[in-house]
């Protein structure tokens, strides 16, 4: 499992353990979860957001109305939590940059490695990195090369999400990007190709055992076109993004993917529709027990992954 990849992306200095309460802020609403009494049981809840309230991105504001987001957080978390406390907060991939970086060498001590990583990021991300929240984890090392996964979020954007959680009466203990959180829900060691749709972005990721081979987020087209035109161009971009990931999977692993693991709004049925056919098997990374207006399909992977370790 990939729980260690997502384990401490943006750690809280006050708490060395992942909170046993998690929530994800999506364009459809806030989903919250905690472990149940039985083994592997997950207790979950959902509070909807009206369209347009969340606009995840690298520039603030990400919310058109923070009070509405805070109210949805409070509703979802209060429904399953007996008392306020620390919570793992999962934010849209579009609000974070996740990169795989190679170095000839990298110091073992974080205090020495972080300035080197920060210097590299200056040329790779379209925002100021001096005060950005940065976390990294060693992926592989050997043969004169060190590969790390790096997650970086602008300080103002991170503060916006944390403020909404605090306004809801909870304390953000760990903040995770959506797909990295969801990857921890993968079971088994077989290579996996994950497609995560959240609002106006799509992320494709490839894993092999505890190694992340690809993480690519694409913001889908939203222009001043008619709704049908926007939908057409977004579907076309999603198809292209998935095709590129499938080709990378086959080139890297010398075999085509047997299936796509879907997470994000709409579940596998919606992903199949957008891809324009069932030429490859698509299944839920984490199936929704029942899909209703109260709990949309495909929305549980992030919180389940966040609770996996």
Residue ranges: model-predicted function:
Residues 1-309:
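Hydrophobic/aromatic-enriched cytosolic interaction surfaces used to assemble or bind macromolecules
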């Amino acid at each position: 499992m990939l729980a260690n990849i997502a384990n401490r992306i943006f750690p809280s200095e006050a708490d060395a353990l992942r909170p046993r309460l998690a929530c994800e802020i999506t364009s459809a609403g806030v989903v919250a979860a905690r472990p149940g009494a039985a083994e592997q049981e997950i207790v979950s809840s959902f509070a909807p957001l009206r369209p347009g309230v969340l606009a995840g991105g690298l520039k603030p504001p990400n919310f058109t109305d923070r009070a509405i987001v805070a109210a949805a957080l409070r509703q979802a978390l209060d429904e399953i939590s007996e008392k306020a406390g620390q919570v793992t907060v999962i934010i849209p991939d579009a609000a974070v940059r996740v990169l795989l970086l190679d170095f000839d060498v990298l110091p073992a001590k974080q205090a020495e490695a972080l300035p080197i990583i920060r210097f590299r990021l200056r040329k790779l991300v379209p925002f100021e990195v001096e005060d950005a929240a940065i976390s990294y984890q060693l992926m592989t090392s050997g043969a004169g090369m060190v590969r790390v996964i790096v997650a970086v979020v602008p300080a103002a954007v991170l503060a916006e999400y944390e403020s909404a959680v605090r306004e809801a009466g909870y304390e953000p203990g760990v903040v995770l990007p959506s797909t990295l959180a969801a990857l921890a829900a993968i079971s088994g060691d077989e290579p996996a190709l994950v497609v995560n749709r959240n609002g106006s972005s799509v992320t494709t990721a490839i894993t092999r055992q505890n190694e992340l081979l690809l993480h690519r987020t694409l913001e889908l087209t939203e222009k001043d076109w008619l709704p049908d035109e926007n939908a057409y161009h977004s579907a076309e971009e999603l198809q292209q993004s998935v095709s590129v990931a499938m080709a990378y999977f086959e080139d890297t692993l010398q075999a085509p993917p047997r299936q796509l693991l879907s997470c994000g709004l709409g579940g596998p049925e919606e992903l199949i529709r957008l891809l324009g056919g069932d030429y490859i098997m698509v299944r839920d990374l984490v199936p929704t027990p029942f899909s209703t207006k109260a709990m949309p399909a495909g929305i549980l992977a992030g919180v389940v992954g966040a609770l996996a370790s």
